[in-house]
């Protein structure tokens, strides 16, 4: 029997955070462990070996950690998708729905050039709202999305299906049941 750890083994679950009934999947324990972090980055990169990727787009906030590491490994640029009002300079914005209300994310107008090949990354895929908004921003600037890569998928929330309905290839390292 193998005792090798998987990416999922490095992720801590915190019960009833931030609200009662929520099982928070905490990737900071994965990021803090050098073996776990390297494993996650390597596995997120593996499906794209040999493909042209011009930029990695990371979704706020843990997507910045992953995106920076992945862009470094690829030798490409990194571009953040941020919450409204956090980026200086000229931006474009996209609204998306939350459970109760709406939110807005932004991208610099000059961050992506038409025809650039983009990999979108984040730690967790829930409903796909943030990722879907980021995808729309990239497409507005003419970027071509190669894939969206996540550490965790919460399949009950339907994010993967949502992104696939937008024509996206979706890669995840592990799934957790429950909210």
UniProtKB/Swiss-Prot annotation:
GO biological process, one term: AMP salvage
Catalytic activity of the protein: AMP + diphosphate = 5-phospho-alpha-D-ribose 1-diphosphate + adenine
Keyword terms, alphabetized: Cytoplasm, Glycosyltransferase, Purine salvage, Transferase
EC code: 2.4.2.7
GO molecular function, a single term: adenine phosphoribosyltransferase activity
Gene Ontology cellular component annotations, sorted alphabetically: cytoplasm
Subunit structure: Homodimer.
UniProt cross-references to NCBIfam families, sorted A to Z: apt (TIGR01090), PRK02304.1-3 (NF002634), PRK02304.1-5 (NF002636)
Name of this protein: Adenine phosphoribosyltransferase
Organism: Ruegeria sp. (strain TM1040) (Silicibacter sp.)
Gene encoding the protein: apt
């Amino acid at each position: 029997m193998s005792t090798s750890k998987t990416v999922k083994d490095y992720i801590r679950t915190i019960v009833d955070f931030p609200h009662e009934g929520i099982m928070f999947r905490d990737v900071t324990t994965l990021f803090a462990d050098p073996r776990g972090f390297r494993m996650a980055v390597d596995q997120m990169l593996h499906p794209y070996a040999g493909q042209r990727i011009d930029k990695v787009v990371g979704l706020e906030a843990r997507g910045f950690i992953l995106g920076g590491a992945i862009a470094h490994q690829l030798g490409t640029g990194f571009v953040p998708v941020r919450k409204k009002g956090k980026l200086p300079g000229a931006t474009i914005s996209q609204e998306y729905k939350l459970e109760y209300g709406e939110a807005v994310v932004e991208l610099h107008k000059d961050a992506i050039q038409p025809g650039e090949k983009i990999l979108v990354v984040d730690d967790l895929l829930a409903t796909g709202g943030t990722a879907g908004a980021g995808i729309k921003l990239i497409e507005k600037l003419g970027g071509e999305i190669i894939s969206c890569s996540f550490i965790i998928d919460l399949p009950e929330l339907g994010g993967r299906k949502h992104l696939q309905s937008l024509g996206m290839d979706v890669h995840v390292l592990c799934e957790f049941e429950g909210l």
